[in-house]
């Protein structure tokens, strides 16, 4: 059985999402919905408590803003989890460099995801690095996966858990649990035959960068980590340097975007917009 653990922002699960799960999963399942509408839990606490209540042999941690398009995805997840004994997701990266990186900032992304970014629907299909002639492969070894959806055997959760002591928010739970698995000798796998649509893109806040600093401090001695690809020592060092530069500019850009969002919420901005466009109903 698959135990689907969801930390929700509403008191109850969205009926449309519940119906989507029921019509696509294709195996026995249960939904463990953690009501976090009052913000009583961070994601680490919520997922740990959900996993402790789970009855299934396969634990599935899921966002509440996704839609499944693959029929029988639950059976696929059960099979790959049983075969690998590790963490399974739909998109991730085959390298984590020696810096404060995220799966989506490192260079060797793998997997398929459809997501909504600023109102635009986009599908990213990342072929495995140096394996362009194997696009039909359905599983690929990785270092970390995105937290929008991932699974693991319940037996593995007895060895690793979401780190409530190091972190206190809603970021880095995915990359941290993956590093725990890797350090203990368990694989991380990306499956390319489960089609999921993600409806939010999120924002890079100060909390995100703070949590990522904690992640790097915890795992620095194990980095870099490479899985599923072969890289020379020189290539790894070049990638480390490139990743550090990319992280710097990502942080600077995020700070600027956060300031813009803050200004747009001020009374002065809204008043100025009204004075400049008194009859406009368009959002700026």
Q: In which residue ranges do the predicted regions lie?
A:
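Active-site donor/metal-binding and catalytic loop motifs
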Residues: 186-210, 214-218, 236
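Donor nucleotide-sugar recognition loop
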Residues: 143-145, 154, 158-179, 186-197
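A recurrent flexible, glycine/aromatic-enriched loop bordering the glycosyltransferase active site
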Residues: 118-152
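Conserved donor NDP-sugar-binding/catalytic core segment of glycosyltransferases
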Residues: 40, 67, 71-116
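Short aromatic/hydrophobic "clamp" motif used to bind/position activated sugar donors
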Residues: 59
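Glycine-rich, basic loop-to-helix element that forms the pyrophosphate-binding segment
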Residues: 38-54
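Boundary detector for helix-to-coil junctions that initiate low-complexity/charged tails
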Residues: 228-284
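N-proximal low-complexity "stem/linker" segments adjacent to membrane-targeting elements
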Residues: 1-23, 32-33
């Amino acid at each position: 059985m698959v135990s689907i653990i969801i930390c929700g922002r509403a008191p109850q699960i969205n009926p449309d999402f519940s119906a989507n799960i029921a019509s696509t999963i294709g195996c026995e399942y249960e939904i463990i919905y953690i009501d976090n509408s009052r913000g009583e839990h961070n994601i680490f606490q919520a997922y740990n408590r959900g996993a402790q209540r789970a009855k299934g042999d396969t634990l599935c941690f899921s966002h509440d803003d996704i839609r499944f398009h693959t029929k029988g995805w639950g059976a696929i997840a059960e099979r790959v989890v049983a075969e690998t004994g590790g963490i399974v997701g739909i998109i991730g990266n085959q390298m984590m460099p020696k810096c404060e990186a995220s799966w989506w900032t490192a260079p060797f992304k793998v997997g398929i995801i459809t997501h909504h970014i600023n109102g635009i629907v986009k599908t990213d299909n990342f072929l495995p690095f140096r394996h362009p002639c194997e696009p039909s492969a359905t599983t690929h070894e990785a270092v970390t996966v995105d937290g929008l959806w991932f699974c693991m055997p319940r037996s593995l959760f007895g060895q690793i858990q979401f780190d409530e002591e190091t972190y206190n928010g809603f970021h880095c739970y995915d990359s941290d649990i993956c590093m725990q698995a890797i350090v203990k000798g368990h694989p991380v796998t990306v499956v390319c035959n489960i089609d999921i649509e993600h409806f939010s893109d999120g924002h890079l806040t100060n909390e995100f960068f703070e949590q990522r600093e904690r992640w790097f401090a915890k795992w620095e001695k194990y980095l870099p980590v490479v899985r599923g690809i072969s890289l020379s020592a020189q290539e790894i060092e070049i990638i480390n340097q490139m990743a550090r530069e990319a992280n710097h500019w990502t942080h600077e850009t995020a700070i600027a975007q956060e300031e813009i969002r803050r200004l747009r919420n001020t009374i002065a901005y809204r008043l100025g917009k009204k004075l400049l466009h008194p009859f406009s109903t368009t959002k700026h």
